[in-house]
Amino acid sequence: CEHLSGYINILRGTNNDSAFSRGLCTPAVTVPNGFNFYSPVTNPSKNTACYNYQVNGENNPLDSITVTHAPSYWLSSYGTWQFMANTSVDGSGSVTAAMISSDARKAKFTHENEVAHAHYYSVTLNEGTAASGVKIEVVPTSHAAYIRFTFPADAENANVIFDSLWGTGTLTFGEDGQSFKAQTNHTSAGGGKMYVVGRFDSAWAKAKTVGTKQG
């Protein structure tokens, strides 16, 4: 490794279940003392232990990548917000909440196609899934992150889904065709609302808010 950070494996301590703890860790992609953490989600029913190493692929595929502020397993996270790639939805037509829900958007993966460091996370989703062959990469900054979605050249659809799984929220898209704003009301242990501002490096073909918080 060129840097000692290359030896860090953030998946250590994530092989847990209700009968035995092996760390109860959140695989946090973040800089030291970062404002946000970013974590893959394989268990959308939990906002702290949202990633379980031993249940992936056929058992529990990737739901999304989440922004999180989980201080520990025992103190619930807050200010969470999710994004996920998708190739199964035809965004040019009508899009419903059911079409971009956790059940609909989840995509199988294997740990062989996953790179998990504090300074860099990537995963390539299995072909034939709701995000067929898509590679997601996350690089953190002090208050945000750079995200890259690489879609197969022959993908019929290239979508990015936004959500606020564990709280109410809002989502709006800018008139410039590239920027968006979101708010998540997932609060806990004194944590307040979180506001999100993002921008794509190229214009989208179509953007739509579903309900108030998804899109």
Label the model's feature ranges:
Residues C1-G215:
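Accessory carbohydrate-recognition regions in carbohydrate-active enzymes
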